[in-house]
C-alpha cells in the first residue's frame, strides 16, 4: 500500500457531484438492494473514471455503503497477485472486494462500469439451462422486446426483436477470485457479450458507462424472470 499517501487520499471520494463514482456506487447498491440483487452483503459494483477504479468494499451491507467506504485503485493495475494491485485509497477496517480481478477483466475490455449481482432469476436460469442443455449450454432467448436493451457488441448498435441473445454461463468456485480465468475465457468465446452468468451464484454485467451497465443489468434481469415464467408455462425461449 505504498501508493497511499498521508491522509489515505480521502479527497478521491469526497465530492458534492451526484455523478461522482464515490456517490454513484452507494446509490447503485441501494437501488440493487431494493431489487433483492445484493442482499446479505453479496454482489458489488465498480466504476472506472480516467485512471482511477472505484470499488465497493467486501463484506459490507450494500444498502448502507457510504462514499468513505469506497476503495480506489490506480489504473491500469495488475490483477494478480493481489498484493501488486495499486491501491491509492483503502478504507480502514474494510476488505477489498473479492470481485476486484473480475471487475478489472471487464475494464480491460473497455467497460466503464461493472456490476455483480446475486439475482435469484439469474441463478434460476443457470440451473434451467444446465438441466435442459447440459453444463456447456448458454442462456438464449429471442423475440422478446426487452432484448433491444442489450448491445450487439462494441460499436455494433443494439440487438433487435428478432435477434437471439446469448449469455455464457461459467461454473461457480469456492472463492470469488477463482472465477477470473473462466470469466475471461467466456469473454474470449463470446467477444460481443456484455454479461457472464455464474451457475448457482449470479451474474457479472458491464457497460460502456454507468447508465448502460445499469440498464443492461435491469434488462437482463427482466429477461431472466420472464424466461423462468416461460419455462414454467412450457413456452420456448427461442422462437423457431
Curated annotation (Swiss-Prot):
Keywords: Amino-acid biosynthesis, Cytoplasm, Lyase, Metal-binding, Methionine biosynthesis, Zinc
Subcellular location: Cytoplasm
Family: Belongs to the aldolase class II family. MtnB subfamily.
Signal peptide: none
Lineage: Eukaryota, Fungi, Dikarya, Ascomycota, Pezizomycotina
Binding-site list for substrate: 99
Keyword Cytoplasm belongs to the record: yes
Residues engaged in binding Zn(2+): 116, 118, 201
GO biological process, one term: L-methionine salvage from methylthioadenosine
Gene Ontology molecular-function annotations: methylthioribulose 1-phosphate dehydratase activity; zinc ion binding
Location of the active site: 145 (proton donor/acceptor)
Top EC group: lyase
Protein EC: 4.2.1.109
InterPro entries on file: Aldolase_II/adducin_N, Aldolase_II/adducin_N_sf, MethylthioRu-1-P_deHdtase_MtnB, Salvage_MtnB_euk
Gene name of the record: MDE1
Protein known as: Methylthioribulose-1-phosphate dehydratase
Species of provenance: Paracoccidioides brasiliensis (strain Pb18)
Catalytic activity: 5-(methylsulfanyl)-D-ribulose 1-phosphate = 5-methylsulfanyl-2,3-dioxopentyl phosphate + H2O
